[in-house]
Curated annotation (Swiss-Prot):
InterPro entries: Aldolase_TIM (IPR013785), Elp3/MiaA/NifB-like_rSAM (IPR006638), Lipoyl_synth (IPR003698), rSAM (IPR007197). One of its GO terms (molecular function) is lipoate synthase activity. It is found in: Cytoplasm. This is Lipoyl synthase. It holds the Pfam family Radical_SAM. [4Fe-4S] cluster 1 binds at C51, C56, C62, S290. The gene is lipA. Its cofactor is [4Fe-4S] cluster. It comes from Pelagibacter ubique (strain HTCC1062). Its EC number is 2.8.1.8.
Amino acid sequence: MTTKPRHPEKVNKPLNPIKKKPDWIRSKLVNSKEFFLTKTIVNNNNLVTVCQEANCPNITECWSKRHATFMIMGDTCTRACAFCDVKTGRPGKLDSLEPVKIAEAVKKLNLKHVVITSVDRDDLDDGGSNHFFEVIDQTRKRNPNTSIEVLTPDFLRKGDAYKKVLEANPDVFNHNIETVPRLYLKVRPGSRYFSSLELLKNAKLVNKNVFTKSGLMVGLGENKEEIIQVMDDLKAADVDFLTIGQYLQPSVRHHPLDRYYHPDEFKELETIAKSKGFLLVSSTPLTRSSYHADEDFAKLQLNRINNH
């Protein structure tokens, strides 16, 4: 019996050798009691995490702090982004019990801040926005003191579906821009740069109190001028929080890594972004959307108060 490939769309792609990681990319290996407790809670509830599915380099550190980013609506994505390690294919039916399972897992982990993301579900009429609403709603009912951050797909061609997510009143609305517009056709072929910008802009118009957030990867072949243009575009969309991290090539079939940025370059990008007026900027090689999200949410709240 042959095993179905995780990325069938990449089977015939040319092989791109993976460059050796520099010393500053090494992630921490922590196998603490808390790590295994987090793993047990996730597994026992049959939950999916982006930590596992996207092969995140920070998983041991985060799980040792009982931080896990839940990925809802299954483990199979309808898009085929060239950078992503999440499985591609035809997803199954939504799990109607998932909202309660997520809420209970948040309670067991005693999370003060939770990040909930999802695969793209282009097969659903609403892109999964109603399911997002239910997950947020159930999580809040069972964990009234937990702040909730969502990392959503773009809801491309789904009209006002995104408004249903905002109706649930998440504390942070995150949608990653991922890369510069020139690289979209190669890196995010199923997405549109300006649609993602519009989503972020509209999110703030629909809910002026929500913190908006977006992430950018570097090392895909972009240049500094293009990165700065993305910063300007995100600021014009009234985005509060920008994250910048190093692209790490998941396999030889994925988009080739152009280069590793030095930590000093990340510092420089952080300085430039801060000068643009973002409420918060996180720019390090291992920065990911949900990395230190709980601490960053506290900083966002403080910075908003101080800016008024």
